[in-house]
Amino acid sequence: MKVVIVYSSRYGNGKKCVDCVDGALKARGHEVQVLNAPQSSPAQIPPADMYVFSGAAEAFGLAKGIKDYMNNMPELQGKKYALINTHGMSKPRGLPKMEKILSGKKKMVKVSEIHFQVGKEANTGNGLPAGYEAQLVQWVAGFA
């Protein structure tokens, strides 16, 4: 299966999640392409069997990089997607916003989601909880 991962990460927590998912997918024999949303053209999103989108919740919304990318990419009707959301709040407020764009406007089909509440070290890129890698590997095994 060909998987495209699109991410936006200000402090590096989301990038760590993406790197782990990239490795887990490749270990399962999948072809993976990783795109940094702010440095990529949404109009030229590569064709894939599945997409993974990763972004942080910031100020009760989505990080600008991933939000702009998803809003400006073409409709991918019927294509499967999974979501990764990092956030500093008690609830993953970014997931519903991501789903609204992808399932609503882009007519894609969600297959899975995962989120991590980052801790006090979030702005250093070390805010993820202990064991996040194992959780991500198990998460990937559930859909790939």
PLM feature spans:
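Flexible, glycine-rich phosphate/dinucleotide-binding loops
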Residues: G12, S41, S90
